[in-house]
């Protein structure tokens, strides 16, 4: 990578300069309470570096998927408040992104202070497919930095988006790679080049369609792919088994069958669960039992049973595969971990990752939320990615606009 780094920017001198930082503050909320502040904590080091160096920092970020206009439930207020609690520098929040509030507060910023601009997705131009519209919004963001500004991309969770605050501002200001993004890319490189073998990939989550491209790219690169989560039922169906009322993407069965055929030629083996936890309905207190994966309809609940977790036999088999690995990448929970009764599979995978001496990477999103919800510490894993979609697209071999624009 030929991108300039944050350390280079600081070496040039940032005291008194406005530095626009794209951070990842897209955190889960329960009302106005942040339920997982992992991304906020991950954003802190770069902001602190710039603050300590005397920069006047303008933070852009998004939260959720507002429809191009302000919505209270997507405000950055809770995230900015949590950032202020964690920081040892002054943090303020503007009531808008490029309006009067942002301009007034930016003008009053002192060296070392941080101003969080309101959710960039409150402006429809942020995500516009029209280059001119995005460019116009980027121009207004850049205008806040005055005549000697710079841009730092520290939001790995957004680098796969060609959005104004990620891509277009980088074409208008001297641009630098934030430490968080730099670390993420270096970690993902270890999963794609010179990977220590055996390389085991654990894939879960609800839909196999979300993982097709990454599976395709991993054939021949990963030694073993362990399949759990809702997507496992499409694999079972592809092998000719009935899955009762479990989540099934029938249109993906031929694709999965093709992958299963190609895998052996490519030197990659798929490991599919041999037992699953089947429930009477989708609820935390649902009746449930463990059955063989090839006999789901033989459960007490018959054809209406719903598979909500991998079974203990499968969890142990997956853990054994992880124990023998030198590199492990995990993306997607094994079951409905939010319900205690169906969290055992996900917990077993997390525990196996903490027990192994292998280099372990937890791909962001639901997997990161799961390990924290289940009581594991970030430090117990080699790396927890802040970008679920971005990490998958990187492993798919796709070009990520937010990274390619920084290469020069």
Curated annotation (Swiss-Prot):
UniProt keyword Transferase present: yes
Residues binding ATP: 211, 307, 338, 364-367
GO cellular component, one term: cytosol
Subunit: Monomer.
Catalytic activity: (2R)-3-phosphoglycerate + ATP = (2R)-3-phospho-glyceroyl phosphate + ADP
Main location: cytoplasm
SUPFAM superfamilies, per the entry: Phosphoglycerate kinase
Pathways per UniProt: Carbohydrate degradation; glycolysis; pyruvate from D-glyceraldehyde 3-phosphate: step 2/5
InterPro entries: Phosphoglycerate_kinase, Phosphoglycerate_kinase_N, Phosphoglycerate_kinase_sf
Name of the molecule in the record: Phosphoglycerate kinase
Keyword terms of this UniProt record: ATP-binding, Cytoplasm, Glycolysis, Kinase, Nucleotide-binding, Transferase
Residues that hold substrate according to the record: 24-26, 39, 62-65, 121, 161
Range of residues in the leader sequence: none
MF-aspect GO terms: ADP binding; ATP binding; phosphoglycerate kinase activity
UniProt superkingdom: Bacteria
Subcellular compartments: Cytoplasm
Family, similarity comment: Belongs to the phosphoglycerate kinase family.
EC number from the UniProt entry: 2.7.2.3
GO biological process: gluconeogenesis; glycolytic process
Entries under Pfam families matching the protein: PGK
């Amino acid at each position: 990578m030929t991108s300039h780094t944050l350390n280079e920017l600081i070496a040039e001198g940032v005291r008194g300069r406005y530095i626009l930082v794209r951070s990842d503050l897209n955190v889960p909320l329960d009302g106005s309470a942040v339920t997982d502040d992992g991304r906020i904590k991950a954003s802190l080091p770069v902001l602190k570096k710039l603050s300590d160096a005397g920069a006047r920092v303008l933070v852009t970020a998004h939260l959720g998927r507002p429809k191009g206009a302000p919505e209270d439930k997507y405000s950055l207020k809770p995230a900015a408040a949590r950032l202020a609690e964690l920081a040892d520098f002054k943090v303020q929040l503007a009531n808008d992104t490029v309006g009067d509030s942002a301009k007034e507060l930016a003008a009053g910023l002192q060296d070392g202070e941080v101003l969080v601009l309101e959710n960039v997705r409150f402006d429809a131009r942020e995500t516009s497919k029209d280059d001119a519209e995005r460019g116009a919004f980027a121009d207004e963001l850049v205008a806040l930095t005055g005549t000697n500004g710079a841009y730092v991309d520290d939001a790995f969770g957004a680098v796969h988006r060609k959005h104004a605050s990620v891509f277009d501002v980088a074409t208008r200001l001297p641009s630098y790679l934030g430490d968080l993004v730099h670390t993420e890319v270096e970690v993902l490189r270890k999963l794609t080049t010179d990977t220590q073998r055996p390389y085991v990939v654990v894939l879960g989550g609800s839909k196999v369609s979300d993982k097709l491209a990454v599976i395709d790219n991993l054939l021949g690169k990963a030694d073993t792919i362990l399949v759990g989560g809702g997507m496992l039922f499409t694999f079972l169906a592809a092998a000719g088994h009935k899955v009762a009322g479990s989540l099934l993407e029938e249109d993906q069965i031929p694709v999965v069958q093709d992958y299963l055929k190609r895998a052996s030629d490519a030197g990659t083996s798929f490991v599919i669960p041999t037992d699953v936890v089947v429930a009477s309905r989708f609820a935390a207190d649902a009746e449930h039992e463990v059955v063989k994966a090839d006999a789901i309809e033989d459960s007490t609940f018959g054809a209406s049973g719903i598979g909500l977790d991998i079974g203990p036999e499968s969890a142990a088999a997956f853990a054994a595969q992880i124990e023998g690995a030198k590199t492990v990448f995990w993306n997607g929970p094994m079951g409905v971990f939010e319900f205690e009764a169906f969290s055992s599979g996900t917990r077993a995978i997390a525990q196996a990752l903490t027990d192994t001496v292998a280099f372990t990477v937890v791909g962001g999103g639901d997997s990161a939320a799961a390990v924290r919800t289940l009581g594991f510490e970030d430090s117990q894993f080699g790396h927890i990615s802040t970008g679920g979609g971005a990490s998958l697209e990187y492993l798919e071999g796709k070009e990520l606009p937010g990274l390619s624009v920084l290469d020069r």
